[in-house]
Swiss-Prot record:
UniProt keyword list: Bacterial microcompartment, Cobalamin, Cobalt, Lyase
Described purpose of this protein according to its UniProt entry: Part of the PduCDE complex that catalyzes the dehydration of 1,2-propanediol (1,2-PD) to propionaldehyde. Localized in the bacterial microcompartment (BMC) dedicated to 1,2-PD degradation. Expression of a cosmid containing the full 21-gene pdu operon in E.coli allows E.coli to grow on 1,2-propanediol (1,2-PD) with the appearance of BMCs in its cytoplasm.
Cofactors (names): adenosylcob(III)alamin
Species of origin: Citrobacter freundii
Reaction catalysed by this enzyme: propane-1,2-diol = propanal + H2O
Designated name of the protein: Propanediol dehydratase small subunit
Cellular-component GO terms for this entry: bacterial microcompartment
One GO process term, biological-process aspect: propanediol catabolic process
Annotated signal peptide: none
NCBIfam families: PRK15443.1-2, PRK15443.1-3
Assembly notes: The propanediol dehydratase enzyme is a heterotrimeric complex composed of a large (PduC), a medium (PduD) and a small (PduE) subunit.
The keyword Hydrolase appears for this protein: no
Length: 172
């Protein structure tokens, strides 16, 4: 396989990651991006690659096989930004896919939450793992520390459902 073919595959994978990542309650405030995305802007990687930046401010043009092999591009460079996710949310909303838009908004919020904390929250949300107070504390933490209002509402909703369905710690 030649370098051009591999580079093309890497670009395609990155393009798909940026256009598909983040599928999940009310959208957050309008995007702080300088762009307003419409369904005609999809896929961003093809139609507006200049709008797509990584968390380390790399552009799609930075993702070449040469840069990957020389460690100029790392796994950290591949993290999606909240701005890109919010642009995807705008596109979904423009396409009439409000639920998908909310999922992108929630994913945008989660970019501020450290991976270890996300795993802790995931485990805490499993049935019979947490008390209502513990879940409410998680919701407060998400809202106050990370400004993740959608995610906080999601955890509060889960807590209420767990009470109703007897899925809290000690209910089993």
């Amino acid at each position: 396989m030649n370098t051009d073919a591999i580079e093309s595959m890497v670009r395609d994978v990155l393009s798909r990651m940026n256009s598909l990542q983040g599928e999940s309650a009310t959208p957050v405030a309008a995007s702080s991006s300088a762009h307003t995305a419409k369904v005609t802007d999809y896929p961003l990687a093809n139609k507006h690659p200049e709008w797509v930046k990584t968390a380390t401010n790399k552009t799609l043009d930075d993702f070449t096989l040469e840069n990957v092999l020389s460690n100029k591009v790392t796994a950290q460079d591949m993290r999606i930004t909240p701005e890109t996710l919010r642009l995807q949310a705008e596109i979904a909303k423009d396409a009439g896919r409000d639920r998908l838009a909310m999922n992108f908004e929630r994913a945008a919020e989660l970019t501020a939450v450290p991976d270890d904390r996300i795993l802790e929250i995931y485990n805490a949300l499993r049935p019979y793992r947490s008390t209502k107070d513990e879940l409410m504390a998680i919701a407060d933490d998400l809202e106050n520390r990370y400004q993740a209002k959608i995610c906080a509402a999601f955890v509060r909703e889960a807590a209420a459902l767990y009470v109703e369905r007897k899925k809290l710690k000690g209910d089993d």
